[in-house]
C-alpha cells in the first residue's frame, strides 16, 4: 500500500535547502548540532484533530475483508450508516441481468458513495441474512450508455457486518501474508501511510502540523548562516521565475506576495524554512528516525519508475540532488508523517 513518493509539504520544505542555483555543495541538517539552535516543545500534543477516521475505517475494513472468515462477521443487528458490509447483489434491467451488475461476497462501506444513489441508503436497517429489492435509476451521465438514465432493480443480500477496528483480530491480519503487517495496529499504520499520499485532508494537514510544530519550539536568535544563505538563494531564484512569468520586477512580485519589499520577503521565507528544517531534524534525532541505504535506494527507484526517468542518476541530475540531499528530503517526509500519526482523528 505504500507509495514511496513524497508529500507536498515535505518536498517544498526540504527542496528549499536542497536545490540552490545549481550548487551541490549544500550543508546537511543531519550533520548539524541542531539542538543548539532549537528547543523542542511537546510535539506529542500539537492540538490538531484530523478528520480522516472514516477513511481509515473504510480502508482497514476493505483490506481486512479480503482475509477474514465469514463467521467473524456480525449478524445480530441491522445495518447502519458507516458500516462495512459483505453483500451479494444482482442488477436487472427489464428483468434481465446486465453485465457488471452481479457480485458475491463484495465489500461495501455504507455511505461511501461507491454505488449509485439509493443503493447504500436502501441497505440501512436491513438485517444480515435478509434480501431486499432496490428500485433504482442510473444517472443520465453514467458511462455505460445502455444503462444511463435507465430504471433497474438490484436484488441485494446482506451477508454480514464487518467488525470495527477494536474487534479485528491480529491472527487474521497475520494470515494475509502482507510483509511487515502482522497486527491490526500495523494495518492501521499502513493505511495511514497510504492516506498520507492520497488523502486531501492529510495533504492540507501537513502544513498545519509544520506550523503547529514551529509554534511550540523555541529557536536561537542567530540561525546557522550557511543554511539561511542557501535557502535565500533558492527563494530568490523562485521569485525571479515568478516575476518573469507575470512580467514584473522581483520587487513587485514580492509585494504581490504580501511582503513590504523583496529583501523582507527573502529574509522571512529563508529564516522560516531553516526553522522548519531545524525542528524536523531535532524530532528525527530524538525519535531515532533515519533513512537507511536500502530504504533510500528503494525510494529512488520508485521515484524513477513513477516518472519519465531512465535511471536514478538521471532523476537526481534533473532535480539537482545528491543521494544524501535526497535522503534529507525523505527524512523530512518521514518526520511529517510521524507527527501526523500522533494527532487525534475523528
Region roles according to the model:
Residues 21-346:
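FKBP-type peptidyl-prolyl cis-trans isomerases
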Residues 1-19:
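Sec-dependent bacterial lipoprotein signal peptides
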